[in-house]
């Protein structure tokens, strides 16, 4: 989507290191004098430092997480979830405090709130946002062609078995890894579970045995080949605001098992096996069903993923910018 009348400038906290491997920011990025942990505190306590202190001549500010950047300009914020209201036990004490201060600031200051799912829209209404400030802006998915060279390289790098169940995500309590590990370990005929993701908090390291293997952080450019190679992608999270790995896995032909009753059901759009994330037997049954109907799930998942377009996300976001400036 071309929007020549819009100039985007990124603003980030100070980092010791550059972008992660394989990622180059698509826009120029200006750096604030503080790193992210300090920024979260000073933004939500003192509304400082202002974005305008490092970028001149801006019309509005778009914060891409619930923690709003400090600004005197019209503020648009993307809220992916309000999980801390549903499950405060899944977050650190400090995290809960920062998120609650952030929510109060958004209720007071945000001109527009972009929600990545209808489930998050519902939660924002319940939290006190009036309807005219809310916009549903679903996320898109980026697909990458996987070559034979990619397949061989990734297979060798991670020593991928012929068949495996895959989980992708940060290791944290709401991802429900303990029940997923129990489910796979209880299945005598199940392929091993491979866990790809960064360490988060509060989740004990997976038991490393023949049933479970931890890959650690996997760069984005390696994930498509792993999605493509997996037998089943299992994502039985307890709570998500969207669940981007679900649609990413579908876009690369993986049969998907995910949770019913949360936003991942919405994202899956009828193209996944849905399970009760709190019931290990349900997760087991879901994995078995996905393995037995893999071809059908692949076809439905690929069709569903075609509806998830970043171009649509961009169009809806630009429309929200224009509405915000017209009201300012």
List the predicted regions and their residue ranges.
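Carbohydrate transferase catalytic cores enriched for Leloir-type hexosyltransferases
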Residues: 1-328
